[in-house]
């Protein structure tokens, strides 16, 4: 998995970057090596809310998640949970498609 973390409207400290990278590292087991993950962390100008957005460019599919809370770390945590659910669904869908093709050719 190739991971890119960037920020918009806030200073991205090395501590915050490493926190995001370690949390998103949980996805590495579920994704292929060639999968690219882009994450943008932002502070909204009004309301003091923090947003974490991610795009996962998997084979044949782009998964996208956005989470916004008053705490940036909580936004990152919720973002990773959201992505994990999407990746499980994506992998299950691909597994069923392969099974369907195999059954079709085997008949």
Task: Cite the ranges covered by each PLM segment.
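N-terminal, polar/charged subdomain of small-to-medium soluble alpha/beta proteins
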Residues: 1-107
């Amino acid at each position: 998995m190739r991971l890119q973390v960037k920020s918009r409207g806030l200073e991205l400290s090395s501590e915050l970057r490493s926190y995001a990278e370690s949390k998103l590292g949980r996805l590495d087991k579920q994704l292929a090596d060639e999968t690219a993950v882009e994450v943008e962390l932002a502070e909204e100008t009004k309301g003091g809310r923090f947003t974490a957005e991610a795009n996962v460019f998997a084979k044949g599919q782009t998964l996208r998640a956005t989470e916004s809370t008053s705490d940036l770390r909580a936004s990152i945590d919720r973002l990773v949970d959201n992505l994990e659910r999407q990746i499980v669904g994506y992998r299950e869908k691909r597994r069923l498609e392969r099974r369907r093709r195999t059954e079709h050719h085997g008949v």
